Structures are given as structure tokens and as C-alpha cells.
Amino acid sequence: TPEKNGADIEKWRTGPVSNKERFGGNLEGIRQKLPYLHDLGISGIYLNPVMEAESTHKYDTRDYTKIDPHFGTNEEFTQLVKEAHALGIRIMVDAVFNHCGINFGPWKDVVEKRSKSRYADWFMIQDWDTVEKHGDTRDGRFYSFAFTDRMPKLNTNNPEVIRYLCQVCEKWIREFDIDGIRFDVGNEISHCFLKELRRHLRSIKPDLYLLGEIWHDASQWLQGDEYDSVMNYPLTSGIQDFFLDRTMEKDEFEYMVNRCYTMYMQQNNNVIFNLLDSHDTERLMNKCRDLDIFYQQLAVLFTMPGSPCIYYGTEIALEGAHDPDCRRCMPWDEIDSDENQERIALVRSLIHLRM
């Protein structure tokens, strides 16, 4: 929706990208493409962070209750969810609760007032004298995500933080009517927080889907009182090892698949989040360079127990290297080409296998 773009927005284009550009993708654009997604057979949309943040990736939250102005307004998000629901499409949002951005109100208060701040225990600060120091946090002055000084870790063991984040999620449900929450860095959020959050949110929306981003065995988070499911990266890796790296024999591949589905209870496997690529990985087509192998992997994805998820652009075999290049613009001006329509039809047929 170019008419809503500001001066800092670059022209929508195809090809490689970095973390510096803003291309103007927004919620209104997604709303306009709902018929396309419905025709493809999509039944759910997982959105990366949409709350107000400084960066282009939006994993450095400033305001957990406000849609980022680059994407639209709270009212536009509410309308998007409403129209998606009318088409049978559910919406899941990304919750960045492991850490925040440096312009999050409580962190700014801590930087200003140091240990006297009422939010002093909302974070894990080891050296109050150097809390304002710039540069990575390997010196241990405070805990942060990936040692970046722009993403201080939240203390999710703190009862006040737990109450605040429970209120944030409740607002998302009551105001926007979301259907699911994906928890970024889901293995570094406290168990006590997740247990309390689940109790609180299930009393409001019993069928809410809680998904953890965990890249390894997640059994301890899947005991029925925290996450419903996790992103099944072990399956992703196994499929890549067999089809792309050729480091597995067929009996080893069979063992790997069985292991992925015997780690967890059946209730978890029924809704486990299966994927072949994401905003955190190299794109599937970039790894394959071979359409036949590309579609073989998709066929495996869609015949496995759980919830198959394709990354936007996979339906046309969109390429992209590791983050951030995997986050390229969707080439809408090329979507109607014969080649892309043939690819879309193939993916649609795989999706319809699940219906």
C-alpha cells in the first residue's frame, strides 16, 4: 500500500536485502492479499513481531500494546484479524518476551534512575555503574539477547514482569482476537512465567495456541502446563541432512523421523509446528537449487503429523540466503507468470492433501 508509506520507505523490489531497508509492507497489504492466501488453502498466518519497535526486524519492542506505525494501527490489525476469521484463517503473533528494546519504558527508567528505579528487578543487571555503556554485554554488566546492548533481557521470574506480560497477552486477545502466540527464544523464558501465563490465557480463550521457539528437545516445556507445541527444527534438520547434505542413509532418516515423533506426547505431535525454512534460516530453494528435491521435501512436510507451515514465497520457490536475505520482498508483480502459477498450483495441491 504505497499511499501509506513514509519518506524512509524504499521502493518495493526483488532481489537480495539487508537489515537496513524498509520496503513498506504493512497490515493493510496483508488484508488485501487474504483472498490470495485463502485460494492457496492457507488456514493460518504466523506474523513476525508487529508491535512498536525501532528496528526493521521488530524484535526490540518499545511498546507491547501498540501496533508499529510502519505496519498500521491497532484498528487495522483488528480489521485484518476479523476478515481473516471470516475466511477461516487464524492469526498467530510473535511475542518477544525474552528481551525488549532500549526504548521500552521500564528500561529507560532503569537507565535514568539506576538501582532506585521501580523497575530495577525487571532486568538482570550486574553492574549499575556501567549500565549505560555502549557495546556488547560480554563484560556481564547486564544480561541481554545475543550480547547486544540494544536488547536487555527481561527477568521473567519477577512476579511484576509476569503480571505485566499476562496483561499484554490478555489485551492482544480481547482487543485483536488473536488465535495463537509464538514465543521468541522460547527456551530462555522462565517456566514459572509460562505456567502462569497459560493458566491466565486459557481462562480467557480456551483454544489459544501457544508455540515455543525451541531448536532442540523441548520435552520439559511440553508437559501440558506451558506450550502446546514447538517449532520442529529437529525434523527440519533431519530432512535437510537426508535430501540435501546426503549425510543420512534411508534407515537413518526413518530413525530420525521416528525419534522426532517419540520425543513428545501424541497431543503435542498432533499440533507440532513443522517447517522447512523460516525468517531465521536460509530459504528452502536456496538450499536445494533443484526443484525436484524442493518438492520432495515439501511432500514429506505435508505428509507428516502436525501443522505444516510454509514461509511466504515458498509457493513460488522464492530464493534467499541466511538472515536477513531470507526476508526478501514478495515479488507480487511476477506472481501471475506462467512459471509461478504452475508452482503455486503444485503447492496448492499439497495443501489440499490436508483438507
Model-derived segments and their meaning:
Residues 1-90, 105-109:
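N-terminal structural segment of carbohydrate-active enzymes
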Residues 45-47, 91-93, 181, 210-212, ...:
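Hydrophobic faces of well-ordered beta-strands that scaffold small-molecule active sites
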Residues 12-28, 60-74, 147-162, 179-188, ...:
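The substrate-binding groove and active-site-proximal loops of carbohydrate-active enzymes
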Residues 81-87, 99, 104-115, 170, ...:
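Active-site-proximal helices and loops of the catalytic beta/alpha 8
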Residues 37, 47, 64, 84, ...:
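Conserved, mostly hydrophobic/aromatic
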Residues 266-289, 325:
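Active-site clefts of carbohydrate-active enzymes
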